[in-house]
């Protein structure tokens, strides 16, 4: 059953493509419609009673849509309406030919004809094809039962004019659903990573525990805390003159800058002592001391 319906669907698609490539003359279409109405009027009346009973049993209500588009001969499926006859369908068809505003909004039922105006073989199955009118660039086709949708029969060659073949796959996931799924996955992964890191920090290994000292306070020492004294730096100055050496020794605070020459500097940080063990007994701490011979220099 599925293969047969797929065959009819493919045939219907081929007929639609042929009508697009070579549109029929409107006069030919009207003549073919008139001939078809005359021949099918008797069959329609015979099927009205059986179709009405079946519609009441299955609660089926299908609208009577006329055909759409130039060059496509069509006929409303009035036999699905139960009590509605062919005369009302003829009136709707005439009104539809004069009104082209419905071409872009309605889903139409198509009866396919060949170029001679005769109905194509298998049209009773092919007329279940629904085509969205106005969608010339990409025609989407629905029809048949679930088995035909899952069949392996090829839907035909791609349209050389750019029409894409019917897409029988599942509908894509909406962007909102995708964004929600991604956020949930990322949130779960981040939470798991944080838990793993917290567990690793709590685990201690013997002999490899890292003890991090506390960050020292940036507060200044209070008055009760005495500042640490830095100390002194021993300075020596040598002057050569006619074979004689003039030597001067003294102490400068550690915070003072090292310069060339005999310079006795003062403490600028307030943490260096006034005297040290080397200069406490040095008489030259206040005055320059001259040593005229190398032998006179104390060790």
Curated annotation (Swiss-Prot):
GO MF annotation terms: metal ion binding
Bias (Acidic residues) ranges: 137-160
Keywords: Host cytoplasm, Host-virus interaction, Inhibition of host innate immune response by virus, Inhibition of host interferon signaling pathway by virus, Inhibition of host MDA5 by virus, Inhibition of host RLR pathway by virus, Inhibition of host TYK2 by virus, Interferon antiviral system evasion, Metal-binding, Viral immunoevasion, Zinc
Region (Disordered): 56-79, 137-186, 205-229
Residues involved in Zn(2+) 2 binding: 255, 267, 269, 272
GO cellular component: host cell cytoplasm
GO biological process annotation, one example: symbiont-mediated suppression of host cytoplasmic pattern recognition receptor signaling pathway via inhibition of MDA-5 activity
Similarity comment text for this entry: Belongs to the paramyxoviruses V protein family.
Further remarks about this protein from its record: Highly virulent strain of Rinderpest virus can blocks the phosphorylation of host JAK1 kinase, thereby blocking the type II interferon signaling as well.
Protein purpose: Plays an essential role in the inhibition of host immune response. Prevents the establishment of cellular antiviral state by blocking interferon-alpha/beta (IFN-alpha/beta) production and signaling pathway. Interacts with host IFIH1/MDA5 and DHX58/LGP2 to inhibit the transduction pathway involved in the activation of IFN-beta promoter, thus protecting the virus against cell antiviral state. Blocks the type I interferon signaling pathway by interacting with host TYK2 and thereby inhibiting downstream STAT1 and STAT2 phosphorylation.
The protein's assembly and partners: Interacts with host IFIH1/MDA5 and DHX58/LGP2. Interacts with host TYK2; this interaction inhibits the type I interferon signaling pathway.
Protein name from the UniProt record: Non-structural protein V
